[in-house]
Swiss-Prot record:
Full protein name: Triosephosphate isomerase
GO MF entries: triose-phosphate isomerase activity
Cell compartment(s), UniProt: Cytoplasm
Gene3D superfamilies: Aldolase class I (3.20.20.70)
């Protein structure tokens, strides 16, 4: 059985005080939770602080981005080896905000995926469609294209131990969310698409849902067979709301 993962993406939020307080509250809220992996991705400047605050807990450290280069004259970038050195494990790539604001292509994101695998880190590959693409019935075609950038260059084996986050762009930060049935249909498509190349890998890959997951809708989403946790945005900045989501994932997979 797949082990669900709930990951908090803090985006461009934080302060030294907030990092200490939020992690302390998360540790308290999640101290007895079992059966669900948990990770947080603070801004890069707070990774070292977060690492120390998480010490001895079951909460893993993640990051929000990585560069394709390992070293050199690339001002402002952070390499996979640096993230590994600091203790980060789960690295978000392909987030719609990176694709939109930084014009990151599927091919560029696939390179990031490969670099992370090479150094032993876990890619959290975000894929998903815009509202216009959704309304045009292109959801599956868009997700397939984004997956194929990795499948066609690195093969299905690259998804062993990796994480995929399906994030319908029209549902991010909008308060809208796909219904559990809608989300399940896309998650099943993603798993089936990988299974065309390797059924065993497809069966074990974690596929999170990442479209406005909150403490109100999480439990119903997690009852779906192909939804393995969540990539959480705004709700991850509140320890109590994030804990409800984690507990819902753990409970759903025990049922």
């Amino acid at each position: 059985m797949r082990h669900p993962l709930v990951m908090g993406n803090w985006k461009l939020n934080g302060s030294t005080h907030m990092v200490n307080e939020l992690i302390a509250n998360l540790r308290k809220e999640l101290s007895t939770v079992e059966g669900c992996g948990v990770a947080i991705a603070p801004p890069a400047i707070y990774l070292n602080q977060a690492k120390h605050e998480l010490s001895g807990s079951r909460i893993a450290l993640g990051a929000q981005n990585v560069d394709v280069n390992l070293s050199g004259a690339f001002t402002g970038e952070t390499s996979a080896e640096m993230l590994k050195d600091i203790g980060a494990q789960y690295i978000i790539i392909g987030h719609s905000e990176r694709r939109t604001y930084h014009k990151e292509s599927d091919e560029f994101i696939a390179k990031k995926f490969g670099v992370l695998k090479e150094v032993g880190l876990t890619p959290v590959l975000c894929i998903g469609e815009t509202e216009a693409e959704n309304e045009a019935g292109q959801t599956e075609a868009v997700c397939a294209k984004q997956l194929d950038a990795v499948l066609n260059t690195l093969g299905a084996k690259a998804f062993e131990g990796a994480v995929i986050a399906y994030e319908p762009i029209w549902a991010i930060g909008t308060g809208k969310s796909a219904t559990p049935a809608q989300a399940q249909a896309v998650h099943k498509f993603i798993r089936d698409h990988i299974a065309k190349q390797d059924a065993a890998i497809a069966a074990q890959v974690i596929i999170q849902y990442g479209g406005s997951v909150n403490d109100k809708n999480a439990a119903e989403l997690f009852t779906q067979p192909d939804i393995d946790g969540a990539l959480v945005g705004g709700a991850s900045l509140k320890a109590d709301a994030f804990a409800v989501i984690v507990k819902a994932a753990a409970a759903a997979k025990k049922a």
